[in-house]
Amino acid sequence: MEKPIFVTQPNLPPLEEFIPYLEIIWQNKQFTNNGPMHQKLEKKLCEFLGVEYISLFNNGTIALITAVQALGVKGEVITTPYSFVATAHSLVLNGLKPVFVDIDPKTLNIDPRRIEEAITPETQAIMPVHCYGNPCDTQAIADIAQKYNLKVIYDAAHAFGVEDDDGSVLRHGDLSVLSFHATKVFSTFEGGAIVCNSKEMKEKIDRLKNFGYIDETNINIIGSNGKMSEVNAAFGLLQLEHMDTFLRGRMNADMFYRQKLKDITGISIVIPSGQKISNFSYFPILVESDFPLSRDELFNYLKNQNIFARRYFYPVIPDFQAYLNVGEVCDVKNAREIASKVLCLPMHAELSSDILEYIVSTIREIK
C-alpha cells in the first residue's frame, strides 16, 4: 500500500458546503463571543445528543479544567491511569492531587471497587473516563458518589453520541466533558464542550470561559478564555448534517474488523460493554503473549507496511516522567498490563473494504 493509512483522519464534508457558512460569518463580522453560529450549535447539539444544557469550548482540555473549577473541587480526585494525559492534567493544573486507581481489565474503564478503596477524608471528586466510548459503570459510580458526598466529572472525550439504557451517557454525573478535536467522531477542528443539568450551572460555566464576566462591568469569578469561534462552530453545524454517514462508515469498519480478526491466535478484541448505541470511535486490540510478535514489534511491522496504528494508551499516565512525583498511584497492574498490549487499528469513516482487507491480511499473514 503506497498511501499511508493513518489511525484516524478528520471527517470532511464537501468543501463547497462550508462556503455558505463562511459567507454568513463574513457578513455578520462576528468571529467569536457567543455569536449566532455558536448559539445555533449549542442548540443543535442539545437536540442531537439528548441533553439539557451544553456549553461550547475552544478545546476539550480547557473544558475539563473549567469543569473542575465550576464544581469548586479541592483536595484529591480519584481518576483512571488509563487515558490521555489531559484527564490528569486538568486536575494538576487546578492544584489538585490525582489519585490513580486500577481499571477493569474487560471494560478498560475505572474499576468502581478500586474507587471506594481509595477514598480518604481529602477526596472530593471522581473523574472517570468512558474509554474508547465504552460507558463506565455509571450506577456503581453514582452510588459511591452519593455515599461519600463526592462530585463526578466524566471525561467523555470518546463518548459523543453514545447511549446506554438511560439515554445519553452524557447525562450521568455532575458534568460530562466532550472533545471535538480533529481526531474525534464529531469535530470542530479544535473544540470541546461541557454538558450540565441546570441553567444555573450552564450560566456559571459560560462566565468561567469568558474571564468571569457577568456583564460589561462586572466580574464575580476568575475565569479564562475558553470560547469557541464562529468558524469552529460553523464547521460543527456542517458536521452534524453528515453524522449519519460518518457513523455508518465507522460501524462498517468495526464490523469488518470484528469478523476478520476474531479467530487470530494471540489477538484479543475489546468487547463493547454497556452501550445501547455506539459511536465506533476506536478499534483497540490486545496483542497477547501467544501472538508471534510483541505489541511493539507488531506496531513497527505495520508501520513498515504503511499502516500507522497507535498505542493508545501507553504508557499509563503515572508512568510519564512528569507524573513520577505527582499525585498518588494505587496498585494499577491491570492498567499497566493493558497498556503494554494495546494497539488501536486505523478507524475512520472512509476506510474502504480494500484498505480494511489490506490491514487485516497484513496481520493475518504474520507467522
From Swiss-Prot:
Enzyme Commission number: 2.6.1.33
Recorded metabolic or biological pathway in which this protein acts: Bacterial outer membrane biogenesis; lipopolysaccharide biosynthesis
Keyword terms, alphabetized: Aminotransferase, Lipopolysaccharide biosynthesis, Pyridoxal phosphate, Transferase
Alphabetized InterPro entries for the sequence: DegT/StrS_aminotransferase (IPR000653), PyrdxlP-dep_Trfase (IPR015424), PyrdxlP-dep_Trfase_major (IPR015421)
Temperature dependence: Optimum temperature is 37 degrees Celsius.
Catalytic reactions on record: dTDP-4-amino-4,6-dideoxy-D-glucose + 2-oxoglutarate = dTDP-4-dehydro-6-deoxy-alpha-D-glucose + L-glutamate
N6-(pyridoxal phosphate)lysine found at: K184
Keyword Transferase: yes
GO molecular function annotations of the record: dTDP-4-amino-4,6-dideoxy-D-glucose transaminase activity; pyridoxal phosphate binding
Listed cofactors: pyridoxal 5'-phosphate
A biological process term (GO) from this entry: lipopolysaccharide biosynthetic process
Function summary: Catalyzes the conversion of dTDP-4-dehydro-6-deoxy-D-glucose (dTDP-D-Glc4O) to dTDP-4-amino-4,6-dideoxy-D-glucose (dTDP-D-Qui4N). L-glutamine can also be used as amino donor.
Family: Belongs to the DegT/DnrJ/EryC1 family.
UniProt-recorded name of the protein: dTDP-4-amino-4,6-dideoxy-D-glucose transaminase
